[in-house]
């Protein structure tokens, strides 16, 4: 039996279980897993010094657009923070934004011919076909309870710049291997 990799995002509004796609986006999944587990070197954007420990723990979902997506992974909580490095997209032809609850990398397009992926990610609550070929899809939310949590987060009250009025906290990310 093959093993599958899952990420469990524990939030203050419930847990979200995501099946990761290492066969379709190996660099992206490795980056996410290593940041989640605290085994990847990064630069703390608050201090400019080397960071250590689980990267995502205690961060917030800083951008929520009802009917579109929820976005997190920025330790600054503003939408412009990252781990101090970037990497290219891994666009796979089998993965398209043709269903809800997909996990993808948030980025700022390409700069100098290179990708701008770092640590920020989003989960869709729609089918944004206009994002095909522009953002690496590297996982999918599984289970009805997890999908309900995503929907709950996607419908919290927001203010300026799509920021939640009450913080939606990503308390921890746990990586699990399960038999297929």
Where are the model-predicted features located?
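Cyclophilin-like peptidyl-prolyl cis-trans isomerases
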Residues: 1-180
């Amino acid at each position: 039996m093959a093993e599958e990799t899952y990420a469990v995002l524990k939030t203050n509004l419930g847990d979200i279980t995501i099946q990761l796609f290492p066969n379709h986006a190996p660099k992206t999944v490795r980056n996410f897993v290593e940041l989640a587990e605290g085994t990847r070197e990064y630069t703390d954007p608050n201090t400019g010094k080397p960071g250590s420990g689980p990267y995502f723990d205690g961060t917030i979902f800083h951008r929520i657009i009802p009917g579109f997506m929820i976005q997190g992974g920025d330790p600054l909580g503003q939408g412009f923070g990252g781990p101090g490095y970037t990497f290219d997209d891994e666009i796979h032809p089998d993965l398209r934004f043709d269903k809800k609850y997909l996990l993808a990398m948030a980025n700022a397009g390409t700069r100098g011919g290179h990708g701008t992926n770092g640590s920020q990610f989003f989960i869709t609550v729609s089918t944004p076909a206009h994002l095909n070929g522009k953002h690496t899809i590297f996982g999918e939310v599984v289970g009805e309870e997890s999908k309900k949590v995503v929907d709950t987060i996607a419908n919290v009250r927001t203010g300026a710049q799509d920021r939640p009025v009450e913080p939606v906290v990503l308390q921890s990310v746990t990586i699990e291997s399960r038999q297929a």
